[in-house]
């Protein structure tokens, strides 16, 4: 008779969890950041609030965002005037949209990842779905399973209401699953739409206005598995992962799901809380590897906003090019909450290949992925890049 220990050893993978494919998707509706204040104050019937509009214009100008994608079009907002008020009961209407559109956008990203992966979808053993946009039962994980036609026996995990750190969380959990279940192939989907957070401006709650200037819609999907087959093409290895709460940061970032939708609350000192705690996270992650030069690794940091990136850069003495991929995604898409770091991974491996660099991590061997969000929670994932094989000339 076999022992429990023998069963356990037989289930373990040999090598580290590896990202095998990445896919992304956005809604068709694209909004230009430079003209967004005019549109936002018009659609919310707030044009008489001229000082507040000027303040919002400055927020948008300083955001380092060029454009964003949003499911909420002018037509949808006109059909749902309660969305355009600051605190009007509107959760039912918001939920009606979110429970359909969040899985649908996630499906687009997942199909893109599955196509790149090149394996039959029947080989997907686990599904993680992550969103801060609406809640439902059965969840978006169930809806995605149905939309993609995955096996009924696929093992699902639904993560609601985690916020901006969760792109790191899903990689941490997928790593543990892939390494402890031989042959596992985990489909991760992070899908976020601003239908739950969009609201009119308030002169007394400027943190809500910050969210209106930063947040965008997007979905990203990755496939994670250990011991890649010859037919699979590894992109990054997941070496270690940690989560920590920054000390004395209670209330720094909060979100509350209420009759009025998801309200967003942010303290001014969030950039300094992140920058003051990030080196400790780096040291704990990289000390075992003998790495202490933060410019020697490639960087994927959740772009909560330009102030966070600027302070992290300054505190650690990072060269400007270290956060190029991060700033590029912020500029092109805005803050897409949990999906952002996966978009940045995609941008980095593509840019590395296009530039003819030696690895998926900008030619470097080791890298770090950071998620920052409510708590204040910091997710730290150590990545190892993969050599890029030169394509046929």
From Swiss-Prot:
Its EC number is 2.3.1.74. It comes from the Eukaryota. The keyword Isomerase does not apply. Keywords: Acyltransferase, Flavonoid biosynthesis, Transferase. Pfam families: Chal_sti_synt_C, Chal_sti_synt_N. Pathway: Secondary metabolite biosynthesis; flavonoid biosynthesis. It is an enzyme of class 2 (transferase). GO terms for molecular function: naringenin-chalcone synthase activity. CDD domains: CHS_like (cd00831). One of its GO terms (biological process) is polyketide biosynthetic process. It catalyses: (E)-4-coumaroyl-CoA + 3 malonyl-CoA + 3 H(+) = 2',4,4',6'-tetrahydroxychalcone + 3 CO2 + 4 CoA. The active site is at residue 164. Belongs to the thiolase-like superfamily. Chalcone/stilbene synthases family. This is Chalcone synthase DIII. It comes from Ipomoea batatas.
